[in-house]
Amino acid sequence: MLKEHLDPRKPSGTGYTSKVRVRDKYHIVGFISSGTYGRVYKALGKNGQKGEFAIKKFKPDKEGEIIQYTGLSQSAIREMALCSELDHANVVQLEEIILEDKAIFMVFEYTEHDLLQIIHHHTQPHRHAIPAPMVRSILFQLLNGLLYLHTSWVLHRDLKPANILVTSSGAIRIGDLGLARLFYKPLNSLFSGDKVVVTIWYRAPELLMGSRHYTPAVDLWAVGCIFAELLSLRPIFKGEEAKMDSKKTVPFQRNQMMKIIEIMGLPTKDIWPGIVSMPEYSQLQSLAMSRAPGHFPRSSNLEGWYQSCLKNGGYATSSGAGTPGADGYDLLSRLLEYDPTKRITAQEALEHPYFKNGGPISANCFEGFEGKYPHRRVTQDDNDIRSGSLPGTKRSGLPDDSLMGRASKRLKE
Amino acid sequence: MAANYWASTQRRHWLFTKERLADIRESFRERDKAAHSQFPLPDQRLLNIYFSQQLIKLGKRMSTRQQALATAQVYIKRFYTKNEIRHTNPYLVVTTAFYLACKMEECPQHIRFVVAEARNFWPEFIAPDVSKLGECEFALISEMNSQLIVHHPYRTLSELQPELSLTSDEVALAWSVINDHYLTDLPLLYPPHVIAVMAIIVAVVFKPSQTSFHGTAAPLAGAMRDGGMNILAALGDKNGAGPPPRIQKLVGWLAESEVDIRAVIECTQELVSLYEIWENYSEKHCKELLGRMVKSKNLDK
Ligand SMILES: Nc1ncnc2c1ncn2[C@@H]1O[C@H](COP(=O)(O)OP(=O)(O)OP(=O)(O)O)[C@@H](O)[C@H]1O
Ligand SMILES: [Mg+2]
């Protein structure tokens, strides 16, 4: 029963030798991506263990030439703990975690695609819209995974196309829980600590306005942005991030706010009563004042944006399976609701007419789709999982926005 | 109670029966009889009192939340279901559990600061090199299979406060009963909501003027044994003369709820025996025995 205690390699209880070795269990076939926290590799199971895996290695800090134990980052700890706890068809599946050679290896099921790659594919060689039923299935699965996270008291806080994984059989898996956290933790927790969250293009207006109180609504804003991007193949609010100054105070994200206002109109206290007490309210007022009257739309222009998006994408403007139609617009406008207290919840969104009307939704988002997406790019330039401890700056595959977002993420740890 | 406790790793992997815990401990003893006779240690609960006092010291200057201390205590318990204490440096385990729990409970502390603080208190047991703590963190996480999220009874307590219209005194007392239960094996034996209900019953039934049991354990233990058990025994007997209305309300709620009354009674008994054994606690004694063990086995190296 207690055989594990007899491991002869194990020194005293507090010393550490891994009982399991990554290379004994997995064959590393190549390198996928390198982010702020480490690298992701593609691997195959060994010794009869079937399947493909993605192994995320958290790099150990280096002190001089020797790698030392320096304590794990809070982000790694959160991701490890949350992934061990969660279990849902629309959340990335963790196989195991191996602690070896002073590094952490999180072994996930391998997913062939992600939304960033899928969106990118639809812009090549020329723009061709993602079929409406596929958008609907993606969004439904995404919201379904998000509902599970929220009912498990988990805020994701970094939803963006690169973090939404898609399996070869068309299942959506929410990935990258590196910024996720539990929100029932009482008292100060959601106010203090990390200041900047969510890649700027997907960042909810209340966060831009300086709120430090995260609620599940921040994730639903991001879902709205992703919905819009699936339809238009471009980030809907593509702002430029204002960098943190030397005093590490978080600047007002003026440009990002402007991008939102250009489409959504100026937020007023009528539509968003809480806005007057937001820390950056005066910044918003001076932003509004700095432009000629009428420069910013008074009211939302989202419907106009949506209609021209349908037109450009060749979606039918009326209704039917070939278009997200009027229901799609209504859902989008409820996701991109300024006031976080009025914004639609994951539960409500799943019951929206966009999903209720228009027939069954496939659990395979590729169902009925003729085209083929390319496989995830796996390179050979670094597939030594043991030595690759320095973070690469280069990302294989597609250009990505995530490095930009993570740069500020690093600062807050 | 949290909807997700039922699916949690805590429920699936970290709930033991009393027998299983006893088996584990017996197997440790079997495997290293020499160490056990050479290095006798105080009763596990007395050691736990000692550990928790060390944690409180560590947390003092770092404005740590109670919940982080509670999580650290659970980590220590889980770790010692996988490792014989006599093969470890408990001071390092306590410090590491604290460091890890602070990160998990969203009040992170820098590793250098934690090590410096620990060296203030136990310079002879904690090396200045932070990598020791980093390594122990790996051991802790690995033994716990990265299952680091701990559900605590505090949350159930605050959820039940309005429902049972508990006074702030009652809540404070229940809170301190919950603090005390970390000194026993209870966190490994029962789900958090059972503990919370037990704490509420103890608080409502005894309503003592003191806000904490510490130091006054013996009279309380007596009172709980004599009075509390009777009341608990009367829970099933709804037609009897019955206790005062305040308590009747609680009894009524309990009957409605699906809480396992037997489990609640067992928890109360564990607590009573904790307060009894507390009488024998001596910090000096724990310190001496642990110190001798760590030093003569070179566990601090
Ligand atoms: N399970 C998986 N299967 C295949 N590829 C994956 C998997 N998980 C992650 N990836 C790829 O690796 C990239 C980075 O993973 P992830 O977002 O988890 O790490 P990160 O260090 O937080 O990265 P970033 O800083 O870029 O967000 C993803 O965008 C995706 O391309
Ligand atoms: Mg990512």
Swiss-Prot record, chain A:
Top EC group: transferase
Matching Gene3D superfamilies: Phosphorylase Kinase, domain 1, Transferase(Phosphotransferase) domain 1
Single GO MF descriptor: protein serine kinase activity
Reactions this protein catalyses: L-seryl-[protein] + ATP = O-phospho-L-seryl-[protein] + ADP + H(+); L-threonyl-[protein] + ATP = O-phospho-L-threonyl-[protein] + ADP + H(+); [DNA-directed RNA polymerase] + ATP = phospho-[DNA-directed RNA polymerase] + ADP + H(+)
A GO BP entry: negative regulation of transcription by RNA polymerase II
Region (Disordered): 376-413
Cofactors that this protein relies on: Mg(2+)
Residue ranges of domain Protein kinase in the record: 26-355
Positions with biased composition (Basic and acidic residues): 376-385
EC number: 2.7.11.22, 2.7.11.23
Binding positions for ATP per the UniProt entry: I32, S33, S34, G35, T36, Y37, G38, R39, V40, K56
Keyword Nucleus: yes
PROSITE patterns the UniProt entry points to: PROTEIN_KINASE_DOM, PROTEIN_KINASE_ST
Subcellular location per the Swiss-Prot or TrEMBL entry: Nucleus
GO CC terms in record: CKM complex; mediator complex
Annotated catalytic residues: D158 (proton acceptor)
InterPro entries in the cross-refs: CDK, Kinase-like_dom_sf, Prot_kinase_dom, Ser/Thr_kinase_AS
Record key words, sorted: Activator, ATP-binding, Kinase, Magnesium, Metal-binding, Nucleotide-binding, Nucleus, Repressor, Serine/threonine-protein kinase, Transcription, Transcription regulation, Transferase
Pfam families, per the entry: Pkinase
Protein family membership: Belongs to the protein kinase superfamily. CMGC Ser/Thr protein kinase family. CDC2/CDKX subfamily.
PANTHER family: CELL DIVISION PROTEIN KINASE, CYCLIN-DEPENDENT KINASE 8-RELATED
Subunit organization: Component of the srb8-11 complex, a regulatory module of the Mediator complex.
Function: Component of the srb8-11 complex. The srb8-11 complex is a regulatory module of the Mediator complex which is itself involved in regulation of basal and activated RNA polymerase II-dependent transcription. The srb8-11 complex may be involved in the transcriptional repression of a subset of genes regulated by Mediator. It may inhibit the association of the Mediator complex with RNA polymerase II to form the holoenzyme complex. The srb8-11 complex phosphorylates the C-terminal domain (CTD) of the largest subunit of RNA polymerase II.
Protein name: Serine/threonine-protein kinase SSN3
Gene name of the record: ssn3
Swiss-Prot record, chain B:
Residue stretches making up the Cyclin N-terminal domain: 53-142
Keywords noted in UniProt: Activator, Cyclin, Nucleus, Repressor, Transcription, Transcription regulation
Annotated GO CC locations: nucleus
One of the record's GO molecular function terms: cyclin-dependent protein serine/threonine kinase regulator activity
Domain of life of the source: Eukaryota
Gene3D superfamilies associated with the record: Cyclin-like
Coarse class of the protein's main subcellular location: nucleus
Compartments (UniProt record): Nucleus
A biological process from GO: regulation of transcription by RNA polymerase II
UniProt function note: Component of the srb8-11 complex. The srb8-11 complex is a regulatory module of the Mediator complex which is itself involved in regulation of basal and activated RNA polymerase II-dependent transcription. The srb8-11 complex may be involved in the transcriptional repression of a subset of genes regulated by Mediator. It may inhibit the association of the Mediator complex with RNA polymerase II to form the holoenzyme complex. The srb8-11 complex phosphorylates the C-terminal domain (CTD) of the largest subunit of RNA polymerase II.
Subunit structure comment from the entry: Component of the srb8-11 complex, a regulatory module of the Mediator complex.
UniProt record similarity statement: Belongs to the cyclin family. Cyclin C subfamily.
Official protein name in the record: RNA polymerase II holoenzyme cyclin-like subunit
